[in-house]
């Protein structure tokens, strides 16, 4: 089934999903809440290729969490993006101190492993931290993701350097069949929307409590700013439908 055909089917299944896909296709921000039983966090989410410095400022000021880019698993393989934990494990062979700090089974209370890969800056940036420079790095990540999925031979190191100020998240190979984090949920939505599956995610934090912004407060924020609010279960249900041969 083509992406457009699947999208037409989804129009009749979940209007909230439909609105989110329309927003993403237009390069607009949405909200994704994973679940009560996982992180219990809401992220601001926007396609990487659509990001401007005002979007980075928006996420920095109103969300406050890490500004990361979730990358499709197929593109991650093409670009040879490693998991950060694997890099540290390899480095720990010559450094006992690294072996002590690397992520171990049971360390994470919400999942089996983290999705962190490299932290990068685009080579055209200076320090890489200003909003306008992070926006450039993010857009270029979107572009190289698209190029890699188009079969073009690209070398990630020609465009980017590490360490940097934008964290890459490598989506699980099985996507939602394997892991249901914001990384996989946002990439699944990108696939359904037929856009480049490189998505910016940023956790929403609460200035008053010092914790993650509650689901209720996140929804209120979304209403005030005209954002579509999706829960992880909605995305999982829609993705299973999209991935099927018919609907």
Swiss-Prot record:
It catalyses: D-ribulose 5-phosphate = (2S)-2-hydroxy-3-oxobutyl phosphate + formate + H(+). It comes from the Archaea. Its cofactor is Mg(2+); Mn(2+). Keywords: Lyase, Magnesium, Manganese, Metal-binding, Riboflavin biosynthesis. One of its GO terms (biological process) is riboflavin biosynthetic process. GO terms for cellular component: cytosol. PANTHER family: 3,4-DIHYDROXY-2-BUTANONE 4-PHOSPHATE SYNTHASE (PTHR21327:SF46), GTP CYCLOHYDROLASE II-RELATED (PTHR21327). Belongs to the DHBP synthase family. This is 3,4-dihydroxy-2-butanone 4-phosphate synthase.
